[in-house]
Amino acid sequence: MKEYIPGEIEPKWQKVWAESKVFETPQRSDKKKFYNLVMFPYPSGTLHVGHVKNYVIGDIVARYKRMKGYNVLHPFGYDAFGLPAENAAIKNKIHPEVWTFKNIDIIRNQIKKIGISYDWSREVITCTEEYYKWTQWIFLKLYENGLAYKKKAAVNWCPSCQTVLANEQVVDGKCERCGTEVTMKHLEQWYFKITDYAEKLLNDIDKLRGWPENVKIMQKNWIGKSTGAEIDFPVDRLDMKIKVFTTRPDTIWGVTFMAIAPESPLVEMLVTDERKDELSQFLKKVSLEDRFKRTSLEAEKEGFFLGRYAINPVTGEKIPIYVANYILYEYGTGAIMAVPAHDQRDFDFAKKYGISIRVVIDNPEESIDVEKMEKAYEEEGIMVNSGPFNGMRSTLALEKIIEYLEEKGIGKRSVQYKLRDWLISRQRYWGAPIPIVYCEKCGIVPVPEKDLPVKLPKDVEFLPTGQSPLSLDEQFLNTTCPKCGGPAKREADTMDTFVDSSWYYLRYINPKLEDKPFDTEDINYWMPVDQYIGGVEHAVLHLLYSRFITKVLYDLGYLKFEEPFENLFTQGMIYKDGWKMSKSKGNVVSPDEMIEKYGADTLRTYILFMAPPEKDAEWSDAGIEGVNRFLKRLWNNIYSILPRIKDVKVEKIELKNKQEKDLRRKLHQSIKKITEDIEGGFKFNTAIAGLMELNNNLSEYLNSAKDLNLPLLRELVEKLTLILSPFAPHMAEEIWHDLGNDTLVVNEEWPAYDENALKVDEVTVIIQINGKVRGKIQTKVDVSEGEIKKLAFENAKIASYVDGREIVKVIYVKNKLLNIVVK
């Protein structure tokens, strides 16, 4: 009998697939299209099995959809710019480009060994000039339409990575890439005006019916829409006003101080001369605090009086202005009207600094005594000390108060978002240059489209210094102004790598097109992506940015769709020894080692069998060995009969006995179940369990049948091979070939199940007496109540429970249960 040797079978079929170009997708087809995409990786190192899970899930979907008759686009590429590759290159003392392409070669070979059915002719690498030319083109389109701009602002700075970070790249006050505490710096930076799309991005979340609910909630929370009022507080003895945003304008009569974020430019404008020295000491102290922890409810409130007062616009009272550590510059206007009676953080601050507390919303059940208050009253209630609104319910008064503020010219209705504009400047080398030049005569000038790409120079000192490495390269920096022809300097910052990944799914459509980023007709045939697969950690970064860029290109007339990803699946992680896999923990499982030991088909099948694919799972060496044993048993079962069924034609299958009927029914039940498992939410683990069960049914039949039904076995092995093929494609191709077929499994149709085969001739009916099981009766299907009662009473054991007792009621559930109620 032929032995199962994955090390021989798998390279053989990978070579056949490559030479026959079977996975190369025609640009157009009469078939229905299916664009299947997995998130591409950073090529900063080799892959471990946690990465592989993503690609294997995508491959099952692609192979299944091809067999279901779709024109499937299944491409792959590399998010090749950015900090991961640059940091690795610095650590290994090698140029980022050399390091990146070396890793790309390794990853490409790893993926080919796993048997992933990518169309390699569409491979995209974001650090190539052919790609980033069009990243720069997108920048220019945003700039031309007022959606890219430069401003000086307080920004997140990572001292380790020596670059700025977008808000989304700061997690709990730390750099999401290296874990270093983030500080603040005032720098001139480039931004994309994503806030112009906040409402659209928010409203369209509800259209994403194929997205997980948790991802949609995360995006809604990140956009963070708040409705309320903007109110102007005049500054005493200065010709200026402080604008605040509040969701609680009903509390304005209770404002007893103002608080400003330490990072706000207002601080320097408002502080009196005699307090400047003390202020700088306070700001220095606050700058050392974790910016996100300091704003939490539990954090110690710290403040500094600026020596100035504002005027409460409704009471006319002078109120002190403080700089306070619990105010975030990024939210609202970076200044707040503080209402200590009705906001806990304001209450804590007022108590600490002896600021007056005034109740303006009373508890309707028990009047509040300000002297006895131990915490803020933050609920709704009855308005008091609130001028014309006294006695009104606070919730009902909100609208009227906003109207009152507008009438008096004090404030206006406003909607604010937590979302901030997307900071895209990076003071690092390994990124797409920003296509802007600075001319003393003309100012900021965009590079003309015909001059793209602005090439990233190769010979640059890229070690991080806090200064953009390109600013030290005179040859790159010095240029001529496209407008006047005079001397000019190039922008030295590079773009955030999230700009590269915000549109890569569009480039796969025409990766080699030279005169435009994509062909409009092709893009509108293929897009949106039908199935997107990747990690949930990208919920408010890549996924939000991609939605934004798609909407911009739609508004500019380049696309006919507003959302890039129709369906999204977020896979769980693979853990080892209870931890996420990482080199530092020494718990990385290499796919190469697993393939060497067990074969790619075993690795693929085990990764999907471990747990439902959306769940986290713990790697088990015993688990992969178990799956390897299953595939060997399946192989041995098939090859034990293959010589006898190779030339058998399946025209008509005669089933001679119950055993044969049962086996054929099990086959078609398996086809039905596995089809439903793949279609209905990626239940790959239960689909594989179904394959294991069918193999057990085959084993039982081969071990017990006196005379093998060869046409039945030919049908079973053929169809079993087809439904096995997405999971273990190399084994499936080998079996298919050895069955005498001259086609490839990947080009075959997914088998349909036979409804007639699913029908059963006999059923087991459970007999209950007063609800307790007293026996089982094997009978033909759809037997009547009278017949089943007769059979039950003929059974001596069952009859003994009924004899001499009155039958009160009989309940019959056809083909399942007979319950006789007696007394």
Curated annotation (Swiss-Prot):
This is Leucine--tRNA ligase. NCBIfam families: leuS_bact. Belongs to the class-I aminoacyl-tRNA synthetase family. Pfam families: Anticodon_1 (PF08264), tRNA-synt_1 (PF00133), tRNA-synt_1_2 (PF13603), tRNA-synt_1g (PF09334). SUPFAM superfamilies: Anticodon-binding domain of a subclass of class I aminoacyl-tRNA synthetases, Nucleotidylyl transferase, ValRS/IleRS/LeuRS editing domain. The lineage of its organism: Bacteria, Thermotogati, Thermotogota, Thermotogae, Thermotogales. It is found in: Cytoplasm. A motif ('KMSKS' region) lies at residues 580-584. It catalyses: tRNA(Leu) + L-leucine + ATP = L-leucyl-tRNA(Leu) + AMP + diphosphate. It comes from Thermosipho melanesiensis (strain DSM 12029 / CIP 104789 / BI429).
